[in-house]
Amino acid sequence: KRIQAEGMVLDIPTYSMYLDNIQPSINKQSILVPCYSSRAKCSMSIPVEANQQPFQYDRGGKIDSLRQYQFKIGARVEPQRPIDVSNTTLNTRAYASQEHLQEFSKALVATGLGNRSLLNHRENFVMGRSLSAMGGTEDLSEKALRVEIEYNSGHANTAKNVFTFVNHIRRLQITPSGLQIYG
């Protein structure tokens, strides 16, 4: 009788997508992610070119001359120091930014996807951040999520649309009185 009264509870991993833009020729900008989920796991932002032909649409993330980025959760910055990607954006492209690849790898693992290959990280650039450790979640219901980005001075960046995907868990409760969804 107790189970019949309480109903069935399911935790369903879902994604929400938020759109923001990067203005051209401005070095320091913020990407606002208006996600107020109570159980967020990770965030992945993909900057794509804003001016594209519909028949030649390219979904690959563009890095241009990005110098560094850092996630802000409320007043807390994650990670403590900005992630430097300038060695990836230099003309020599001598080596990849290991901090960036590590953060992106942690974001993929937090979603449950895992990573098989990060070989094309320059051609398909994604800024990722796991919001908690060990499979946990972060409560964003009272906080704002932002990505602070900074471009190299002297290099003009192009206008971009930033698609941010937030992986979070929604709770579905089915009772005799009806269905409730908690986010």
Language model segments and positions:
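Flexible assembly/topogenesis modules
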Residues: 1-183
